[in-house]
Amino acid sequence: MDPRKSIDKPPHHDPILGVSSRWSVSSKDNKEVTFGDLGSKRIRHGSAGADSEMLSMSQKEIKDEDARLIYINDPDRTNERFEFTGNSIKTAKYSVFTFLPRNLFEQFHRVAYIYFLVIAVLNQLPQLAVFGRGASIMPLAFVLLVSAIKDAYEDFRRHRSDRVENNRLALVFEDHQFREKKWKHIRVGEVIKVQSNQTLPCDMVLLATSDPTGVVYVQTTNLDGESNLKTRYAKQETLLKAADMESFNGFIKCEKPNRNIYGFQANMEIDGRRLSLGPSNIILRGCELKNTAWALGVVVYAGGETKAMLNNSGAPSKRSRLETRMNLEIILLSLFLIVLCTIAAATAAVWLRTHRDDLDTILFYRRKDYSERPGGKNYKYYGWGWEIFFTFFMAVIVYQIMIPISLYISMELVRIGQAYFMTNDDQMYDESSDSSFQCRALNINEDLGQIKYLFSDKTGTLTDNKMEFQCACIEGVDYSDREPADSEHPGYSIEVDGIILKPKMRVRVDPVLLQLTKTGKATEEAKRANEFFLSLAACNTIVPIVSNTSDPNVKLVDYQGESPDEQALVYAAAAYGFLLIERTSGHIVINVRGETQRFNVLGLHEFDSDRKRMSVILGCPDMSVKLFVKGADSSMFGVMDESYGGVIHETKIQLHAYSSDGLRTLVVGMRELNDSEFEQWHSSFEAASTALIGRAGLLRKVAGNIETNLRIVGATAIEDKLQRGVPEAIESLRIAGIKVWVLTGDKQETAISIGFSSRLLTRNMRQIVINSNSLDSCRRSLEEANASIASNDESDNVALIIDGTSLIYVLDNDLEDVLFQVACKCSAILCCRVAPFQKAGIVALVKNRTSDMTLAIGDGANDVSMIQMADVGVGISGQEGRQAVMASDFAMGQFRFLVPLLLVHGHWNYQRMGYMILYNFYRNAVFVLILFWYVLFTCYTLTTAITEWSSVLYSVIYTAIPTIIIGILDKDLGRQTLLDHPQLYGVGQRAEGYSTTLFWYTMIDTIWQSAAIFFIPMFAYWGSTIDTSSLGDLWTIAAVVVVNLHLAMDVIRWNWITHAAIWGSIVAACICVIVIDVIPTLPGYWAIFQVGKTWMFWFCLLAIVVTSLLPRFAIKFLVEYYRPSDVRIAREAEKLGTFRESQPVGVEMNLIQDPPRR
């Protein structure tokens, strides 16, 4: 038996009567009120979602040309006039016929691929052919094939998922009954029936539910990740008509499809009557029906037009800073390539001029055919000018791998490997929410190692967002006795028909206040206390859900809602005897100290960030109409009746004290409405609710007009505890050189208190507070702060605290530069009373004025713009849904995971990727320069001693795998060393792992090594009878050995995979050379066997290795000995074990690490 059903309720009715019959009162113990002229009025959700950055068409204005008509239960008529999409979804990108052209088109968006395609095409021309036509295409074809296979596999999985989704079954009203129909065949305008625990196949407007009041409960986990149940309502006018679907006539005029899952704006016309529809009347695809037997609705959006599919766009695309910097070096390499080609062409021109009379017989340019073969033809010679032209482009073809085509695919593979290890890091797994780290943007892993500015939300990011009611101020009197003894209070419960109901969560109570509520309304003080807790129980959107316990006679009331603050306040009201036990579309039921009372909900203005408050108008059991309002003090005190000035003053004093303790505060007010006020509000509310143009603005205006002259009832104080490990994490990040900005909507006192508890602020910091109400005042405060910091030279101990009002003048005027100058000199920045759009503005302010990397982290929808504005966005999968996660590049469960993410994985990723890019430049340039040196000894022609297949396989097989393995597995320092010494993170901030200087050092080393590889065999075999193919094999093997040993010299942590990759590549290169030389049709037939059996071959190989790498080894040794880097010092300390014996420079991070996952 459901205790909610045991509460006596009148049968449902919705008469349209005169204004005179406003009330009726029933039994003494179960008081109820019905409003004859209004019926059992459903809850209206007005003034919702007014955040400017979150507004879409559904919450702004809708014009007739932007509307669409849906005829209820008439899909033929609906789809005849409008070409609506079907309900079939398609997340797959390709089909069998479009895969090849579309995939190639997408891949060739990379300019490098176009470059190699042009090279391959040039090689097909007879005048420019250097390599075999097949061999020249192979590198590009290999890269394209690998990417195509990966894309095809991913798309196959999408196709399979689409088929499963589209073939699910739903009940659709057809031919006078509900029939099963595949989801993909559902059309707009059809009426569908969804049963309990089923998932909705489309977006539908509710017509009726199994609950006679029209309420339905849905879970939106699949849509936004929130597990709390939400209520949606069918219109009272459609409940009775839905019983006879055959005669149901009407249409819906709604906005066109949009992505805003929190907004919907439409009108319904039935029997000539116009009804307004809002977000509370629509259920979206992906939602799951809960605690409701069935629901009927009409399809308004289907398939790709549903809000769920429109939001299925994934994380935003960003490019890493390292890859952007890499493009500069690629341009430099391109210029270097042009220089080499120009040198080859110019020297060839000089040589041709000098030897123009010998071209008939001289080697490489012989024009005459002296063979005695029949039909012999002279060699083609195109003349001096054309030969120079062709030489240049032939050089481009020969030296093409100077631009490393394999680098792109290598970077992708390395990032996938890095993401795998980040995702499976047990120390970034949150047991409380059972959530692992998510890497949603693979292409910016290395940016995690270069963060300089961190912008963090507070609520839900630094704190748990699990609110606990702490104390209250009623009529200016503080009730904050929070002695531990109070925790032994058994908690409030009621008995209904032998069933005990009690709140699911217990709240510590103030004994004085508890005793006051027990006295009823015996005194004025007790009356105000009762009004206060009645306000908390009634002024909200919480849904009470009754759940079973192990004791069949005891049931728990669980309060589900979208706001943790509201949940805490309703639980507090229940603890003091005001137990909310039922909410429907038109009324709420509250048990007040054993007496069940029913309140008709006449109207509800939900919270929005413009008003910063919410209000509800109730028809009370005493036949009065009362307005209850709660909101932020900044918005509430301005609408209070000034005659209560003394109470307001005392309340402000208590609010300041609460905020100084780090508590979140709200102010509660109320007033009774007379008949004329109510009727005036009701007519305005009805007009605004049914408006299709500017509805949100009209509702805000209606709310603002009624929310005036309030009597202050009291204020609440809620504690939002810091997440575990936040203080240690912030201190480590600051030691790492990361400037932490905390952006919060809380009061300044609350924000400062949290700043101290989180170690963002310290007691020895000098605080610069800027609270300005004008542009001139703001400018003067900033200039004084700038001068003060510059004169005292104490930037390391200065904290800047600025409020949202001041930021309005800063962000909208020319003060951004001044604020940036001040902030750069401060070690901590705290912004309070900040609106969501200001968060993004602050990030943009810093991002546009520095080349340093920025990271933003948050957990709610109000953090989305900030997350997307920053170079790196991190979402917390917390209590406020998944909007932040869906907009982020990385997602995790707790703020403290930023420490291992940045200081460990970020450092590793940056170091590895920077080294890998430089190494790829080096290994390709070595090979190209060997080919270039050879040109100088072949009359400046573009012939090569190295076989074309070795040229192709060099960057694909011979040297590619080791660099990928090192990029994924190598670690320059251990995890604990990086955590214990956050200063080591500065390596990335200072770009020590990759820079233009390092690039030029690498190129100088490349020139030396290529010269050693080429000239040692050249001079060793000078004057001998060795053929060019044998010499080419020696150069190939020497190059592979040298570049792999070069890599081996830089490996820090060896394992069997690293050994297999490096030494295996050398062995694989030798095997490939042997296989190529045993093919009779190739020019180097048996060459390796001829040269490999001589002692000179092995001597040259040894001499090349020593000569190439000895200078590098010596310089590296001297630099590390005389000018060691921080990383080198830390590495040596690791080897010697001195870190374990000494005190860490940073803070001990063991306290903020999760235990390994089981």
Swiss-Prot record:
Keywords: ATP-binding, Cell membrane, Endoplasmic reticulum, Magnesium, Membrane, Metal-binding, Nucleotide-binding, Translocase, Transmembrane, Transmembrane helix. Residues 1-30 are annotated as: Disordered. The active site is at residue 457. It is found in: Endoplasmic reticulum membrane; Cell membrane. Residues 1-15 have a biased composition (Basic and acidic residues). It comes from the Eukaryota. Its main location: endoplasmic reticulum. GO terms for molecular function: ATP binding; ATP hydrolysis activity; ATPase-coupled intramembrane lipid transporter activity; magnesium ion binding. Expressed in roots, flowers, anthers, leaves, vascular tissues and stems. It is an enzyme of class 7 (translocase). Mg(2+) binds at residues 859, 863. Residues 123-127, 352-391, 935-948, 1021-1027, 1078-1090 are extracellular. The chain crosses the membrane at residues 101-122, 128-150, 330-351, 392-409, 915-934, 949-968, 999-1020, 1028-1050, 1057-1077, 1091-1115. It is a multi-pass membrane protein. Involved in transport of phospholipids. Contributes to transmembrane flipping of lipids. Has activity with phosphatidylserine and with a much lower efficiency with phosphatidylethanolamine, but not with phosphatidylcholine. Belongs to the cation transport ATPase (P-type) (TC 3.A.3) family. Type IV subfamily. This is Phospholipid-transporting ATPase 1. It comes from Arabidopsis thaliana. The lineage of its organism: Eukaryota, Viridiplantae, Streptophyta, Embryophyta, Tracheophyta.
